[in-house]
Amino acid sequence: YSICLLFILIASCSDTKKGTKEVGDSILNHADLNPLISKRLSFMLDYKLDSLNFPRSMKKDGSVLGVSSQDWTSGFFPGVFFKLYQITEQLVFLEKGKEWVAFMEKEKFDGETHDMGFKMYCSYGELFKITGAPEYKDILLTSAETLSKRFDPKVGSIRSWDFGEWQFPVIIDNMMNLELLFEATKLTGDSTYHQIAKTHAHTTMKNHFRNDFSSYHVVDYDKMTGEVLQLVTHQGINDSSVWSRGQAWGSMVS
């Protein structure tokens, strides 16, 4: 929880004149937070390196739920190390993040998921911001190209899932993957990626949101015509409910 609090405080800081390093220092030096944060950072650094055991969450018994690099959350752990390096300038965080992210390169070819932004931009994207290394740029561009192949111009969206009884399901979470496409256009000058992301966002704004601006979790489209078939919720209470995490994903529309 201390790590989460750290980054919430950083993200919510309203003083745009302060850089990440300055804001991070002010938090890390806070007397009430420092011992807790230090304990969590040590736990992260000591966590055993394992390509099949990226830490995702804590179980009820206090043990860590580990996942493979294929999981949609895999990029978060190395990404946090890169953010910590930006804040502290301590190389131990950069090097530890590199160790973990090396297991993820193969995911750039995973065309069976829409979670390329979650996985690859939150990890390699942050590493590229730090180093500017061409090999990381290439990984990002390959990831963006893989993601773009899930876009259907008839629907105007990037397909989310390949399972279930839906024809062409698009979930609100998918908004979080568009940043990878915008970055690909910045890096290449090819507007195709930007246009795909923009079209997907406009389609989401049109069909995912109710009159009160709450959102559906899943919109299922006719893959032949692009017409809306169903407005449903897969992870919320019911089809008319507001799934709070999904509502947060949808904030990326703006």
What are these regions (language model features)?
Residues Y1-L5:
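Sec-dependent signal peptide recognition
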Residues L9-S12:
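C-terminal motif of bacterial Sec signal peptides marking the signal peptidase cleavage site
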Residues G19-S254:
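Glycan-recognition and catalytic cores of secretory/periplasmic carbohydrate-active enzymes
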